[in-house]
């Protein structure tokens, strides 16, 4: 291509509309990065080779070093070539920038051509002939300038493109052993394990569609004697889940269904001990009436109904089906609907007991105290009830003298208050 034959519009247009130095700059950066990596790899190989010829010196290390040394030399030479390639790319960039600066900008060329058209259009009497000639001379200078810039750019680019050809890496393997390696690979592929592995994958591919097809078919179309494998697997899964739900350490295993009625029955019996325990505590402990901050307890005891009849055994336990009692709209056991007798006044009951009876009551009346203790929260609906022995009643004659000595002492008592629940 002869740049002198091209007008400045073409040469300048090519320089200004091209991609610029960006692609060449990216190439130079890539060559520099490749050179750095090759140098680092070659240095690592050289370090390993020095170790082979040092503490690990021997026939094997010598063979390995002799095989790897040519490859290390090739990497070092290639790294140098990559550095040269990056430098040459930067030379090309410099050549482009110089040619771009020497090229006439396209707007200047366009203005010259527009001025020429105006001068020619107004040159009626030839008065614009000198100006036309001057304009043409400027255009020719632009032509020559662009041609010279393009010639210089071509020469600089040719110099920058001169590079030493890269060589292929040396062969570091023994060609004579490649045949033996291929035979060993073929023998391994022909073994039973290799054959099983190769046949298992096609079987898997064919088994999956068959299983899906079996799931898609109706159950009646299958043979009654032949059970599909996936059905057997589902049966095993159900067996496993059944053992997990009904095993010996699950809730049904620890508490079988036969124990549930027992729990319900014992709850019905224990619930009858509620109100009587409050009566035993408020009516049988202490030697003086309740006064002061605890005075409201006497009023509370007067209005707290206690169900049951006299005696330690309490009400009889009955069982039946379909004959539950009703408290409002709530179904309850039959014993819960027995009328609650009036509780005696704690003030009168406390007069019969002395503080001196408390030590003996700790041993004699412990059973009565615990027997009347409330074992549920239904204080107002406790079953017809058990009456505990008065605490200290059996020991009163033995400690009468001591009781007289301490009659005036302040009475101390631990009182457990269980509020009555609304019906």
From Swiss-Prot:
Phenotype caused by lack of the gene: Invasion of the infant human brain microvascular endothelial-cell monolayer is significantly decreased in transposon mutant.
One biological process term in Gene Ontology: response to host immune response
Top-level lineage group: Bacteria
Coiled-coil regions listed: none
GO CC, one annotated term: peptidoglycan-based cell wall
Induction per the UniProt record: Highly up-regulated during the early stages of invasion of the human blood-brain barrier.
Family membership noted in the UniProt record: Belongs to the mycobacterial PPE family.
Function description: Could be required for host endothelial-cell invasion and/or intracellular survival.
Name under which the protein is recorded: Uncharacterized PPE family protein PPE29
Lineage: Bacteria, Bacillati, Actinomycetota, Actinomycetes, Mycobacteriales
